Amino acid sequence: FDVAYAFTPPGGGTSEGANDDTSGSTVSMEVAQAIASREWDHTVAAALWACEEEGLLGSAAFVSHLPENQSIKAYMNFDMVSLNYPIVPPPGYGPYDLGIATAGANEDNLSQMNEWVRMVVEDEMSFSDTPQNDIHWASEETCASDHCSFFTNDYATFNFFSAGGDISFWQEWHSGTDNLDFMVTKAGGSDNLGDGFNTLVWTSLNLFIHIDNTDDS
């Protein structure tokens, strides 16, 4: 579940990590648990993908082998999301951001998707930018994670990504030191780390409600 970037991991190769991407798997499972407790208008599938580093093989296979007469209304992707709003970074570090990128839809639908994000962030969750927390969303197509398998096939996607605010994380990226202790330290404690996860779960759940309540156009 690691993110594939266009430079060489400092540790040489890859390693299963807490931020990249056990964090994304954790959020996915928490959201799935919340969604499973209610009835919805649309069928919901939760997935953890294999072989992202080898070329998005798991997600690409899923998209390529959908059952006949089935389609995908929207897809949410969580990749490297530990350090985000409202966690305050240590002194001297850059802001911990909440970033959401939309892709895979026509212009009108992308505008609607971005408006949903704005409504959730500003009106429903009452989040706001601070010097320590940058909140941003935009339509953007980047193939750094499994959402690429979906938006390149014209399925609407929301990609959640929080880089961690500064260059220090990339010293741990794809190495054995990307572990829970490291992430707790960067978050200033386990409670703060939990607050960041709660941001993602509630934001994505509210977005899901907007998606489910619309028709299939």
Q: Whereabouts are the PLM-identified features?
A:
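Catalytic-core environment of secreted peptidases
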Residues: 1-47
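Residue-level signal for short, function-critical loop segments
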Residues: 3, 50-52, 163
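Glycine-rich, flexible loop/turn motifs
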Residues: 14, 36, 58, 169, ...
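Residue-level preference for long, well-ordered alpha-helices that form the structural scaffold
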Residues: 17-20, 24, 51, 105-110, ...
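Solvent-exposed, polar/charged alpha-helical surfaces in well-ordered, non-transmembrane soluble domains
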Residues: 25-33, 37, 60, 64, ...
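Metal-dependent peptidase/peptidase-like ectodomains
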Residues: 39, 49-153, 157
